[in-house]
């Protein structure tokens, strides 16, 4: 995985250049944008975080955050603002922002927020990869295997072959055969692991 990037969006050129220069000196990879629209036009779901000015023309910070949430862009956001108040900061945090920093702020505070955001982004992406891998395993199942798997997930304390067979109108021997195939295809060894895998898919 490539190094994470700080995506900096601020309509004031002096703020962009000052912050970009300071962050690069601290070893961060930085991409700067003068507007939310410019960022959206160029962003390719790269990992990192977004340092976002609250009060911008055209699309402001909260509007961009809302748009990203609607379109499932999970890049963590750190708001910076020279005139945002408590209501705005509360709204941003409720919508998932990492933090809301009032200008002027200490560079050390921003750096700490960036590290937190990078950690959150990594966790989110790893969870998405695990979910996709789990879904791919379930896609290996036939319709009958999926039916039996669903029964076992919904009735983890009642997975005897006779009970499953009675519920699905098939023989216990057929249940045993399908159960073995289910565990093999899902790369698991027990009903407990089946339930855990299903929880990953549904997360």
Language-model features: locations:
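C-terminal output helix
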Residues: 85, 101, 105-114
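Acidic catalytic/metal-coordinating carboxylates
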Residues: 34-35, 60-63
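Helix-turn-helix DNA-binding segment
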Residues: 135-173
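Active-site beta3 strand of CheY-like receiver
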Residues: 45-52, 56
């Amino acid at each position: 995985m490539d190094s994470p990037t700080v995506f900096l969006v601020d309509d004031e050129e002096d703020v962009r250049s000052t912050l970009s220069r300071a962050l690069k000196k601290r070893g961060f990879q930085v991409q700067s944008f003068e507007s939310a629209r410019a960022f959206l036009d160029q962003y390719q779901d790269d990992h990192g975080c977004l340092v976002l000015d609250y009060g911008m023309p055209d699309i402001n910070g909260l509007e961009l955050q809302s748009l990203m949430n609607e379109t499932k862009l999970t890049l963590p956001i750190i708001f910076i603002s020279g005139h945002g108040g408590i209501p705005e900061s509360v709204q941003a945090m409720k919508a998932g922002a990492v933090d809301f920093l009032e200008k002027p702020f200490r560079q050390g505070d921003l750096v700490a927020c960036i590290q937190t955001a990078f950690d959150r982004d990594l966790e989110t992406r790893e969870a998405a990869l695990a979910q996709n891998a789990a879904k791919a395993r379930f896609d290996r199942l036939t319709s009958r295997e999926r039916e039996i798997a669903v029964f076992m997930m919904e009735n983890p304390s009642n997975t005897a072959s006779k009970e499953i067979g009675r519920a699905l109108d098939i023989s216990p021997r057929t249940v045993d055969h399908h159960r073995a195939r289910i565990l093999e295809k899902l790369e698991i060894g027990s009903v407990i692991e089946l339930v855990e895998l299903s929880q990953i898919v549904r997360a």
